[in-house]
Amino acid sequence: MGEKNGVIIRVTGPVVEAEGMAGSRMYESVRVGNDGLIGEIIILEGDRATIQVYEETIGLTPGEPVVRTYLPLSVELGPGLIGTMYDGIQRPLEEILKNTGDMIERGSSAPALDRTKKYRFYPLAKSGDMVREGDRIGCVRESVSVNHYILIPPGLSGTIHFIAEQGEYVITDTIVILDTGEEKKELTMIQRWPVRDPRPVRERLDPVEPLLTGQRIIDTLFPLARGGTAAIPGPFGSGKTVVQQQLAKWVNADIIIYIGCGERGNEMADVLEQFPTLKDPRTGHALSSRMVLIANTSNMPVAAREASVYTGITIAEYYRDMGYHVALMADSTSRWAEAMREISGRLEEMPGEEGYPAYLSSRLADFYERAGRVSLLGSGDHEGSISVIGAVSPPGGDFSEPVTQNTLRIVKVFWALDADLAYQRHFPAINWLMSYSLYSPIAGIWWEEHIGPEFIRMKQEMMEILQRENELEEIIRLVGPETLPESDRLLLLKAEILRESYLMQYAFDEFDTFTGPKKQYRMLKAIFTFFSQAERALETGISVSRLRGLPVIESFARMGTASPEEEDPLFESIARDTDAIRDLKEVL
């Protein structure tokens, strides 16, 4: 360790070639140059290694040393991850700020986890207990929202020879001595894990319930299952980042991992400013108390975008192994793909479509396939899940480009953001005609069992109304709305109510930003009860223009923004006004 192992012979952007690297392994982490830049071996030919460097390589020259670490690129896992902001290679940015100032100096490093902070350790096992990989042997309170379970690392089993008593310890203290039969192994609260290797599980399970987000169009029409995968493609300005941040704020997961991969720094600044002030609707604590942020902004080295994605999913797997439900947001996977394209070009590989490497689809699949609901290792019947939501930024909003198309082959939910809806100030700008979810049957059953009957019928009817409205728009453009029969005019009124009072949601309103499932069902029930009464009124000769002027239409628009105290009076008022429609024929 620490000896000079190789010498740089060529530098091209983030890619470095070195010789004298005989005995090295693929994906081994190395220190490059006099400044000790962090790199990873990606090609080996004889004693020559091609290294992907995760820091700025300006000033690096042939002849400088390359030092092996004899370890794969890994992350540190243990108490202290929650509430911390890292860069793509798990350097804590607040520590780097204290050490080097606003700009990260080349070769800067700091321990990923605080070695000085003490945590109160609660043992969950005793001396003499037989334990195996994945078993919980202790617990520390990592934040007000998260109990951090100390687990037997994968690949180890044996008898506990010693376990620390309840008390205050730093994460490097020995808390367990495990007799494996071959040796007595000291365990601390820290584990290291290679970022490219998925952590093992006992069994992969099918999703059985939706991951509720509080966003009406998602929960009702295009639900994501707990342990599922989703993509949010959209052109610039269509609201990808706001949707991602909304999901990070309100999704009903235990842990949130937010990866800012190649996006603008001010978006991460927004997250840093907002999240500590926001309250988790489930616990009442700050949202930052259950969140890990990984910031690899557009002005940071290109190669580190890949590392940031793998770092994030590895941390997510670690918390999943504790039995938590984790939601991971990657904004944006397109920037990661662009980094792959640049490095592939530097390596002079044969390009695929639009210059992306031929292995683009397999790399994306490797990432998304680490999501899922799983049965965990260890004694007992524990399960956890990772739900992955990846933003895609197709140039010009072209969904036929390779990153979007390869992502769509993998994920089960597609939320297509539409620039036209965004320009109309309809947010979330998810196009209901282009989007889809393969988890709808699972979610529909859950809604009917836990929230209320008729949900599936109302959802299907909503989609039929919106699709029929789209067909009628062609006719309206040609001949105008005056020529339509009253039944079609009523359908247009229904679609308008659904679009403006239900699907449209204001992210910056205190109450409209999040709508729970019971309120969503209540809103749908009120709207469809009105639709039934309106159809009967139409049969008795009442015009759609008369229905359009009723006060209940305005009340629908206030449902989303109503506070909990205002909800009951508002819905009672809507019910009275809806019932009064049957008396309209007497006024004619």
Swiss-Prot record:
The gene is atpA3. Keywords: ATP synthesis, ATP-binding, Cell membrane, Hydrogen ion transport, Ion transport, Membrane, Nucleotide-binding, Translocase, Transport. Its main location: membrane. Gene3D superfamilies: 2.40.30.20, 2.40.50.100, Bovine Mitochondrial F1-atpase, Atp Synthase Beta Chain, Chain D, domain 3, P-loop containing nucleotide triphosphate hydrolases. Component of the A-type ATP synthase that produces ATP from ADP in the presence of a proton gradient across the membrane. The A chain is the catalytic subunit. PANTHER family: H(+)-TRANSPORTING TWO-SECTOR ATPASE (PTHR43607:SF1), V-TYPE PROTON ATPASE CATALYTIC SUBUNIT A (PTHR43607). Pfam families: ATP-synt_ab, ATP-synt_ab_N, ATP-synt_ab_Xtn, ATP-synt_VA_C. ATP binds at G234, P235, F236, G237, S238, G239, K240, T241. The keyword Transport applies. Its EC number is 7.1.2.2. It is a peripheral membrane protein. This is A-type ATP synthase subunit A 3.
